Curated annotation (Swiss-Prot):
Pfam families, per database record: UPF0262
UniProt protein name: UPF0262 protein blr1257
Origin: domain of life: Bacteria
Family according to the record: Belongs to the UPF0262 family.
Record-linked InterPro entries: UCP032146
Length: 165
């Protein structure tokens, strides 16, 4: 028995992701590396089901900042528009700030600190990343269904975007 399109997740996935070049903040090689890995991992395995799309993916996603909002421009693989979601950046500001501070500490630590100190900082970094991922999942509720791993990878991409505030 086949599942109805809205329950069959085989097409509920992202096959391409782009970031708005004007939204990308300045970053060093460590952040660029994380971004490349997040995009690769996201495309390799994800669950991304826009509400109302009835499993008619796969999808492409363009992420950017417009005004004070995070923009998710979702399209079908052939470029046909599905929906554009604008999410307030407010819930992410403190999390992203904390994430960058701990990432700075982590990148400094991996060059000079003991393995125990690196592990402790990395645990804190993962905890803040998980918090951002859960916040993103909550903000997308009723708009786009994503699993936790997809949300984690999307949050990584959000952190490389630049916004004022």
């Amino acid at each position: 028995m086949t599942k109805p399109p809205e329950q069959d997740d085989s097409n509920n996935r992202i096959v391409a992701v782009t970031l708005d070049e004007e939204s990308i903040g300045r970053s060093g090689p460590d952040i660029e590396h994380e971004r490349a890995i997040a995009i690769y991992d996201l495309i390799e395995q994800n669950l991304f089901a826009p509400e109302g799309a009835d499993g008619k993916g796969p999808f492409t996603l363009h992420i950017g900042i417009t005004g004070n909002r995070l923009m998710f421009d979702i399209r079908r693989e052939d470029g046909a528009p599905v929906v554009v979601h604008l999410l307030s950046l407010g819930p992410f500001r403190g999390i992203v700030k904390d994430y960058f501070m701990i990432c700075d500490s982590y990148y400094q630590a991996i060059r000079t600190a003991t393995p125990d100190k690196i592990e402790a900082i990395d645990m804190g970094r993962r905890g803040i990343h998980d918090e951002g991922s859960r916040t993103l999942q909550e903000r997308l509720k009723g708009k786009v269904r994503v699993d936790f791993e997809t949300s984690r990878r999307l949050f990584t991409l959000i952190t490389v975007l630049h916004w004022k505030g």
